[in-house]
Amino acid sequence: MVAICFSSIHVDYNFNAFDCQALTNNVLKVYNIRDMNINDIKCFLLDLDGTVYIDGKLIAGAKQAIERMRKQGRVIFLTNNSSVTKDRYVKKLNDMELGVTELDIYTSTDATKNWLKKNRPFSRLYVVGSDEVISDYAKDFCVTPPFDTVVLTFDKTLTYDKLVKACDLISRGALYLATHPDYVCPMETGYIPDVGSFIMLVEGATKRKPDVICGKPYAPMAEGISEFTGVSPRFTAMFGDRLMTDIKFACDNGMTGVLVLSGEATEEDYLSSGLKAIVKRSIAEWDR
């Protein structure tokens, strides 16, 4: 368990190449990461949006790639997207004939719940989310007033009234959690605002950053997935299309990072980031 002091938490959203390189060098020293042979990997963590599919359309060769991964180790679909519940991901992935259960999926919602259970189990949550997401939190926590905690999720039903309520609670000192820091979510036609954009809006209104961000690249997600899989980070690979969430997550937590160029990041972005990763055009090429 990570000890966290709410009053001293500072989240820096402005990463530069120098900072990332310094951090990566430090992590390499701490975790003694070597250039991992992909054949040594026992757990494959796969981002979804931009890695396995884009806007609901399976990336070419992804199904066959996942089948090959399963012959070598465990495959977990690891996503920051907190807009829907886990059962929706099961249906979506099975509609793509990927053959998954809830035991094959771990989300930023899972990481958020796990953090709350360990650190604030009796919280009364004001969840900025869809009705189904709120109902999901209600299985484990109280989601009725008086609220003492705000949980900001990727709410595609976001309204002005929800923002007003959340900002009022945050301004009055409520514990403030965000599920993940992604600014945008990739769609087939472009990008739409994600939780990172909501965070900036809330900060502009309240002058507060989240006390805890639970998804990639932060510690709550790493702790949660480690407990979920039981596999050492040394034998775990994170596949994703985003440098500052997926690949930074791998670097910060002793995993092998595999950047796929099927989503947000380009090869030029990677070269200027200072982060350490294997680079592939898509997940289909993971073992080539």
Regions found by a protein language model. Name each.
Residues 31-46, 54-71, 83, 87-106, ...:
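Asp-based, Mg2+/Mn2+-dependent phosphohydrolase catalytic module
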Residues 5-11, 15-46:
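Non-catalytic pre-domain segments flanking phosphatase-related domains
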